[in-house]
C-alpha cells in the first residue's frame, strides 16, 4: 500500500477546520469551528481573503450558480456570498493579520466588512442547523436539501433560487418545495439525519440519499420534471425505493458517484449501495449493498474523485484513506495530521486532494 506525503500544508486557522472545498479555478475555501472562512490561492499557497461567515461552526460549503460560495453554519444560517475577485488586489493576507482578525471573536464580522469590501452577502436563509448534517445541493435538479426546521428525523427540499434572491430582510426562510420527507414506518426508528446527497440520473430522475443515526441508508427518487412541485405531501413527489441498515453505528457520510452510492459511519465499514434506475423500482427490489470492513472506526467524510475511480475517507484517527471505487480495496494511507480529519475534497479534474483537520491545518496531496 502506498504511503505518500503532503506536498504542502496550509496554516491559517486558529481552530478546528471543519469544511474544505475547491472551486473550479485556483482557489480553495476552508471553514472552521469559529465560523471563519479563508480563501486560499493555490498558485501562491497564501490566504487571499478571510472573513467570519458565521458565528458558530461551519457545517458545509458548496459552489453554486455563477461561482458563488454558499456556506452552512450552526448559527442556523445558509448564506450565499458574492466574491468579486476582480476588485481584489494582488496583495495577500499575512498570517499575522489573519490571526489578528480571528482574535476579534464575535465582533470579527464588523472588522471583516471593513477589510473585505469585495465580499458581500447575496442571500441569507434561516434554516435548521442544530444537528451536524450539512446541506446538499444539486445544480442539475436545482434543489437544496436540509434537515426539517423542527424535526431532525425529516428532510425539506428548497428551490435553489432561494440562494440567489438578494437579501430583502433578515428572516428570509427561502422557498420550500417539499417538506417532512421521512422513511416509511416499516423501516423503524431511524433517529436524526446525519448526511445527505443528491444527484440526477439519466437526465430523468433525481435521487436523494440520507444516512441516519440508526445506521440506515435510505434512497428516495422523483422525476426531474416534478422536483419543483410545491406540496405538503412529499409522497406526491418522492418515492422511497431503498432502505438498508448498513452500519452498526450512525452513518456519517453518504455520497453519490455516477450510478453508485457510498456510505461511511462511526463503525469500520465502507458500503457500496445499489441505486434505482427507474421510479418503477419498488422497495426491496434492489440488491444488498457491498461491504468493506476497514478495521478503522470513525470515517467522518467520504468523497469521490471526478473520474469515479477512487474515493477517500476522513478518519477520526487523523488518517485519510484511499480506496478503489470498483472493489473498495485500500490503495493508500494519507498520514500527517496529529488529530482527527473533519473534511476532505478532491480538486475537480486533477489528482490533488485536501484534508482538513482538528489540528487547524490543511494538507494537500497528489494522488495517482
From Swiss-Prot:
Q: Which InterPro entries did the record assign? A: WD40/YVTN_repeat-like_dom_sf, WD40_repeat_dom_sf, WD40_rpt
For this record, the Gene Ontology CC terms, alphabetical, are:
cytosol; nucleus; TTT Hsp90 cochaperone complex
Which keywords does the record carry?
Answer: Chromatin regulator, Cytoplasm, Nucleus, Repeat, WD repeat
Among Pfam families, the record links this protein to:
WD40
Q: Which domain of life is it from?
A: Eukaryota
* Chief location of this protein within or outside the cell: cytoplasm
Query: Which residue intervals correspond to the WD repeats?
Result: 12-50, 53-91, 246-283, 294-333, 336-368
Q: Where in the cell is it found?
A: Cytoplasm; Nucleus
Q: Biological process GO annotation list?
A: 'de novo' cotranslational protein folding; chromatin organization
Function of the molecule: Component of the ASTRA complex probably involved in chromatin remodeling.
State how it assembles: Component of the ASTRA chromatin-remodeling machinery complex.
Family named by the database record:
Belongs to the WD repeat ASA1 family.
| Entry protein name | ASTRA-associated protein 1
Amino acid at each position: 500500500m502506498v504511503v505518500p506525503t503532503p506536498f504542502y500544508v496550509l496554516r491559517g486557522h486558529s481552530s478546528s477546520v471543519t469544511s474544505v472545498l475547491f472551486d473550479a479555478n485556483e482557489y480553495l475555501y476552508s471553514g472552521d469551528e469559529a465560523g471563519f472562512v479563508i480563501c486560499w490561492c493555490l498558485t501562491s499557497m497564501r490566504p487571499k481573503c478571510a472573513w467570519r461567515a458565521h458565528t458558530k461552526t461551519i457545517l458545509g460549503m458548496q459552489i453554486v450558480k455563477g461561482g458563488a460560495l454558499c456556506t452552512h453554519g450552526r448559527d442556523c444560517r445558509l448564506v450565499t456570498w458574492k466574491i468579486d475577485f476582480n476588485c481584489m488586489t494582488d496583495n495577500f493576507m499575512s498570517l499575522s493579520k489573519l490571526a489578528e482578525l480571528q482574535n476579534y471573536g464575535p465582533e470579527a464580522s464588523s472588522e471583516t466588512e471593513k477589510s473585505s469590501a469585495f465580499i458581500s452577502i447575496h442571500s441569507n436563509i434561516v434554516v435548521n442547523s442544530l444537528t451536524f448534517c450539512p446541506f446538499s445541493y444539486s445544480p442539475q435538479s436545482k434543489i437544496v436539501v436540509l434537515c426539517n426546521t423542527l424535526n431532525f428525523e425529516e428532510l425539506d427540499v428548497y428551490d435553489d433560487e432561494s440562494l440567489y434572491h438578494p437579501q430583502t430582510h433578515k428572516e428570509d426562510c427561502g422557498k420550500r418545495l417539499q417538506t417532512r420527507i421521512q422513511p416509511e414506518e416499516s423501516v423503524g426508528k431511524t433517529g436524526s439525519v446525519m448526511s445527505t446527497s443528491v444527484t440526477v440520473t439519466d437526465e430523468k430522475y433525481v435521487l436523494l440519499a440520507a444516512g441516519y443515526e440508526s445506521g440506515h441508508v435510505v434512497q428516495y427518487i422523483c422525476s426531474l420534471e416534478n422536483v419543483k412541485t410545491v406540496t405538503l405531501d412529499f409522497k406526491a413527489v418522492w418515492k422511497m425505493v431503498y432502505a438498508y441498515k448498513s452500519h452498526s453505528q450512525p452513518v456519517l457520510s453518504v455520497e453519490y458517484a455516477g450510478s453508485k452510492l457510498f456510505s461511511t459511519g462511526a463503525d469500520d465499514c465502507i458500503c457500496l449501495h445499489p441505486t434505482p434506475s427507474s421510479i418503477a423500482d419498488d422497495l426491496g427490489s434492489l440488491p444488498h449493498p457491498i461491504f468493506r470492513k476497514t478495521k478503522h472506526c470513525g470515517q467522518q467524510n467520504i468523497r469521490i474523485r471526478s473520474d469515479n475511480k477512487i474515493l477517500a475517507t476522513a478518519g477520526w484517527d487523523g488518517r485519510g484513506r484511499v480506496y478503489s471505487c470498483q472493489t473498495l480495496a485500500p490503495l493508500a494511507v494519507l498520514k500527517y495530521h496529529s488529530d482527527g480529519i473533519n473534511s476532505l475534497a478532491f480538486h475537480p479534474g486533477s489528482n490533488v486532494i485536501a484534508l482538513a483537520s482538528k489540528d487547524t491545518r490543511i494538507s494537500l496531496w497528489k494522488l495517482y
